[in-house]
Amino acid sequence: MTDAPRKRRRSWRRFALLLLLLTGAAGAFAIANRGYILPFLPEQDVIRFERWQRVTYASLGWTWPGTPDLNALDQRLAAAGVKVGAPVLVRIFKREFELEIWLKKGDRFERFATYPICKWSGRLGPKVRQGDRQAPEGFYTVGGKALNPNSRWYRSFNLGFPNAHDRALRRSGSFIMVHGGCSSIGCYAMTNAQMSEIWKLVKGALDGGQQRFQTQVFPFRLTDANLASRAGTADGDFWQSLKPGHDLFEQTGVPPRVSVCNKRYAFEAGNPGADGSAELETRCSARTAKVN
């Protein structure tokens, strides 16, 4: 009688190990052949496929290809000519599963690192209401009070959703984070290892005197081709509205001044040397570029 439970436990362990190995093999095969598989799938299926691969990697303790060398932060900072404490700016690209950290060097920001996002939830498009499990898109500012060193998901910072633009459109939700781990119901999960480095950089910037850092969240790389291929979709106009702010930063390396006018994002070029600390304002100006 006492041997039966032991045999069942051993059987379940063998089954679990086999399942883990098969999952790992399938994940390795899928990733190795992703260039052949992905072009034939609808975009939302491609996104689900990407999530599955990344969650599989994380569950097996593997490092996703393209992850920065997290053991060489000091050397990477030295090579870039910057230090912990430099003002920071964050950009997120959902479709590419990438989070970028930009650090201020002189009067401009320069891209320091690109981190693969482990998981975000929902589809491409903005968060609209509480419980829709959407990860937001738009322009946000993050201050010291938004940082949580004791997060359920290791460490986190609150994006500040809903911002003035979201509130103008009566979008609802709360506690939308960038955090560790690899689970999401509306947040951006980065794994604990990556979040440790991201945390060090953003906290260092805030401790060093930056009041807030700008976080720009885009559905995908806002190239003309990417926008044209999605023109006429439900979110096409909203995505087009993000491009002026995206392009101002690309062109100048200075965070744009962001405001909301008539429920629409509006952008002005940031002053030379600005660090992106300015909060989102609700105001209209003759100088602002107004697009939805």
Listing of model-derived features with the role each one plays in the protein:
Residues 190:
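A conserved hydrophobic position in a structured secondary element of the catalytic/binding core
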